[in-house]
Each structure stands twice: as C-alpha cells, then as structure tokens.
Amino acid sequence: MTPLQLTPQWTGSILDVGGGGEGIIGRLYGQQVIAIDNCQEELDEAPDGFQKIWMDACHMTFPAEQFDHVTFFYSLMYLDRESQKKALQEAYRVLKPGGQLHLWDAEIEKAYPEPFVVELDIQLPTEEIHTGYGVVSDVV
C-alpha cells in the first residue's frame, strides 16, 4: 500500500480529468472542482459536493483558458498513448495563462497477463481512503 497525504493548497477553479469513482480531488476541494469522466457509472459513484460532467478528455467542450488547475489523478494510465497526448493537449488548452497541471500516475512496466495495480492509502484532512487503480493490457 502506497501512502499519499493530500492537503488543500490551491485557489481558483480546478478541472479534474477522470474525476469519477472515489472523486479524490473533488473531496479535497469541493465546489472549486469540475470533474469530467467518460464513464457515467464512475461519475455516479463519486461523492456529492462538486460538479460532475460526462465528457471525453480528448475532446473537451470547455472554452480555452478556463481553469486555474487541471488534475489527472491516476487517470492517464487508462488511456492509450495517442489518447494521453490528446488529453494533455486539451488540458493545456483549457488552462489559464499561468495555470498549473498536476499529475499523479504510475509507471507501468507490465500489465499482462497479470494486471498492474497500484494500491493507495490516501490521507485527506477529514478522512482516509483505501483504494486501488489498475489495468490489464498487453500494450503499455
């Protein structure tokens, strides 16, 4: 289990790409966050307290220079290389001048035939979350 302590320290608007599921960034920053995910079930699982929108990270419908921060919290690992490139280009497009891109992800050496899983013990100011993120793929 990998320990990870997160404390709120950013001001301004935050776009959380792949922010469904546990909704870690949304839990941490609340109404500052708009989380997008291309899986409605993941958005439905995310807790309340922040805005959730079904959207493809490779084709965002937000205007340019919209957000102070864009986060990818263990979400790039679910995209193929070309989609990663497109999602990062879109993130750059929607960042305000001087905005910040924040990435948390895993270096995956092999995810086939056994799945690659990173287990996290996430400490937020008001709660602790035990979770894991993983992939199975013969192409990493």
Model regions and ranges:
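Conserved alpha-helix/loop element of class I SAM-dependent methyltransferases that forms part
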Residues: 1-12
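Class I SAM-dependent methyltransferase SAM/SAH-binding core
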Residues: 15, 20-59
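A short SAM/SAH-binding and catalytic strip from SAM-dependent methyltransferases
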Residues: 69-82
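Short alpha-helix
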Residues: 130-140
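A short glycine-rich, Lys/Arg-flanked "PGG" loop and its adjoining helix->strand segment in the class I
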Residues: 85-97
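A short acidic, Gly/Pro-enriched loop at the edge of an enzyme's catalytic core
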Residues: 58-70
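Conserved class I S-adenosyl-L-methionine
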Residues: 102-127
